A protein has these predicted regions:
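C-terminal regulatory or interaction extensions
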Residues: 1-81
Length: 81
């Protein structure tokens, strides 16, 4: 599986098998601008089916976390090789 978006690859590697909040992902990536992160990392990863919400019916849930989908896990395993 090849993916051209390096931001999605980076996000998939960071999330891995964990469930992370936006704040946690920002800290690990080293970004400070939440809007930039959402527009260029998280939203494209969700739109392309690599990441999903822990509470999909409540996007603003106070304990919202993000995790990899099956497609995201497949990419994660490939990147770990």
């Amino acid at each position: 599986m090849h993916i051209d978006n390096l931001n999605i690859q980076k996000l998939v590697q960071i999330v891995g098998v964990a469930k992370l909040s936006v704040k946690e992902m920002l800290e690990v990536i080293g970004l400070k601008n939440r809007e930039h992160f959402l527009n260029y990392y998280l939203n494209p990863a969700i739109a392309n089916g690599y990441v999903c919400l822990l509470y999909p019916d409540k996007p603003r849930h106070p304990r919202q976390r993000y995790l990899l989908t099956e497609k995201g896990l497949a990419l994660y395993k490939e990147l770990e090789k």
